[in-house]
Amino acid sequence: MTRLFGTDGVRGLANEVLTAPLALKLGAAAAHVLTAEKRVDGRRPVAIVGRDPRVSGEMLAAALSAGMASQGVDVIRVGVIPTPAVAFLTDDYGADMGVMISASHNPMPDNGIKFFSAGGHKLPDHVEDEIERVMDSLPAEGPTGHGVGRVIEEATDAQDRYLEHLKEAVPTSLEGIKIVVDAANGAASVVAPTAYEAAGATVIAIHNKPDSYNINMDCGSTHIDQVQAAVLKHGADLGLAHDGDADRCLAVDKDGNLVDGDQIMALLAIAMKENGELRKNTLVGTVMSNLGLKIAMDEAGITLRTTKVGDRYVLEDLNAGGFSLGGEQSGHIVLPDHGTTGDGTLTGLSIMARMAETGKSLGELAQAMTVLPQVLINVPVSDKSTIVSHPSVVAAIAEAEAELGATGRVLLRASGTEELFRVMVEAGDKEQARRIAGRLAAVVAEV
């Protein structure tokens, strides 16, 4: 049986894969698993539910809420709000679980559901497996009378609580910094510009008018050209691009050059080391982190640890090791002292705080690492499980690694959210990386 949960919750085409009946069952099962030990002294468990603006979000929120209420859980709906805000509010309200309805950077027709446990933590695999196990075994009858959960619509103070949290996390004045923010017509459309303005920055917001259908449409972190053009047009000091649920952030310097998650981690790691905030002098990245990040961290006397792709795995390593900074090349940056998951708005504030504290431009700060040429090809496949062990693929990888030697690397991995196999090659020369990646992709496509 195919596992329902991927690397970032349950995701699929809304109303075809991710249906209202499925959301109802998921809500009930998750409530049963996550609140089983919280029902003491007549206490009623509480869940926080947020969503991004896509049109299917209201339908799925209603179904999820009904499922949780059917298990005796009180549901507090917090409306359109970023994923990291749901994680924060789960802890801040003292709730027993949280749910975010979003498909992140995926197109509008998709949607997704991700759960948080008490404290705002993403679920480990074994808990997700338990939710799947009980989905079809819960009795049809649930609590009755006073035991039925309530649904509290749109808590009015949720956004203000989150904005105050961001202000406390990064109190540095950003006065004098001019920024363009691309909110992807998503969950950050109000929060991000408001947070940056509250910190003192001059803000030009683009793609910040969601209409239920335009989320991620030619905008946001997957269409970085939009913020690049706007930075040049307005003469801004930098640009920030968020994704649909605002748990990631990519940056652009004043000349329109991309500053990706690896570069952001490099500049923040060096800053935190200087300030005595980088615990154990360690940064946590993933296997997709550019080789240039490893080289830069070695030069700075910082240890780089790597995990599987997915900010949940970065988080697990951060928590297990007691580290204070981690993230992904895609722009998921995690600062455990201020949050339990990637937070695009917090990342943006942290970048600008470093600019304000040093008086340096983002372009200057980004020179903390040299990005090696990297080519990534996504290959559609029907069966991801057999690719990496197939003899022809094994032979092709060995040939590529022999050609690259110590000057580059090869990584093949299955996507956790789509029917794709990702072929990544890094090399000292872009053309060499492109040629080797193309060769490997062709082999994968034939398997």
Swiss-Prot record:
Annotated active site: 104 (phosphoserine intermediate)
Keywords associated with the record: Isomerase, Magnesium, Metal-binding, Phosphoprotein
Cofactors, names only: Mg(2+)
Modification Phosphoserine, positions: 104
Reactions catalysed: alpha-D-glucosamine 1-phosphate = D-glucosamine 6-phosphate
Domain of life: Bacteria
Molecular functions (GO terms): magnesium ion binding; phosphoglucosamine mutase activity; phosphomannomutase activity
GO BP annotations, alphabetical order: carbohydrate metabolic process; peptidoglycan biosynthetic process; UDP-N-acetylglucosamine biosynthetic process
HAMAP family noted in UniProt: GlmM_B (MF_01554_B)
Protein family (similarity comment): Belongs to the phosphohexose mutase family.
Protein name (Swiss-Prot/TrEMBL): Phosphoglucosamine mutase
Species for this entry: Corynebacterium glutamicum (strain ATCC 13032 / DSM 20300 / JCM 1318 / BCRC 11384 / CCUG 27702 / LMG 3730 / NBRC 12168 / NCIMB 10025 / NRRL B-2784 / 534)
